[in-house]
Amino acid sequence: MGLFAFLFGRKKKDTSQALQQPAAVASHAPGTQIAYSPDLIPKLKTEHQQLLEIFGKINAAFAKNDLSLTARFLEDFRREIQSHLLTENIRFYIYLEHSLVQHMESLSLMHEFRQEMNAIGKAVLAFLNKYKDIGTRPDFALPFSRDLEDVGKILVDRIKREEETLYPLYFPVY
């Protein structure tokens, strides 16, 4: 009678332990010591939001013609984007490269994104280097305005495509 009661809803199964124990996953991508982390994608998405927030502060400071504050936010942005790119390159791309080895289409897509991100990263860092002294160089204001707008468009587009297309490829290897 206990089985029928369980099947037809008279008894509830105790799921508290099942909820507390994570599902078993392989600890590393094949051939690496890079482990799958269920927290990685939420962390990267949070970093994206932080980067966009700092970028908004750069825009706001520049709009107020506060070049000193603009320079400080540019340095904050540099620090955050370098950290983000390092995390993506080490924990995300290397893991994907090894875990997608049997999925050539997805692997090819990941390589395209990685090459594009490397180019974007270099361009953004060149932008940051070019304008690091904007706080003491008001003559930088006009070209900075145009370049800032371009970087903003590239950043927003890249984040959107990364989160919609690339991040779903990250999953545990069994």
Locations of regions flagged by a protein language model:
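Small-residue-biased structural context
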Residues: 1-174
